[in-house]
Amino acid sequence: YAAFDVANHFWEWCGGLDDSATPRFERYPSEATRRDWVEALLGGVAEPAAVDRFCRAVDVFAPLDHLFWGLWAVTQAAALGRSTGFRYLLYASHRLSHPSVAEAVGRAI
C-alpha cells in the first residue's frame, strides 16, 4: 500500500531508526506539510478530493506502521537475540509505546 509506505517515510523523519537513538516523534510532519508532500507525490495534478483521500489513508496507516515494525523487532529479538548487536527490544519499545498504537488497537477491538 502506497499510503503505508508514505506513513513509514514520515515516521522516518523522527529518527530513532537504530537501537541507540530515541525517536523524536515531534518531528513528525504537520498536517499541512504532509498534504504538501502528498500533493507533490501525486504530481501536483490530483484533484483535492484525491489528495484528501490519500492523506486520510496515510493517517490510518501511521499507527499501523509502528505496530508492524514493533512486532517485526520483537520477532527479530526472538530469532536473533543480540547476535547482530542491534537491541531489537528497545527498538520495539520505542515503536509500540507510541500513543497512536494503543488508540488504533482500541478502535479495532
Task: Locate the predicted segments by residue.
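Active-site activation/catalytic loop segments of kinase-like enzymes and analogous catalytic loops
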Residues: A3-P48, P63-R82, H98
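Acidic, serine/threonine- and proline-rich low-complexity regulatory regions
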Residues: E47-V60
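Regulatory N- and C-terminal appendages and interdomain linkers associated
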Residues: L71, Q76, L80-I109
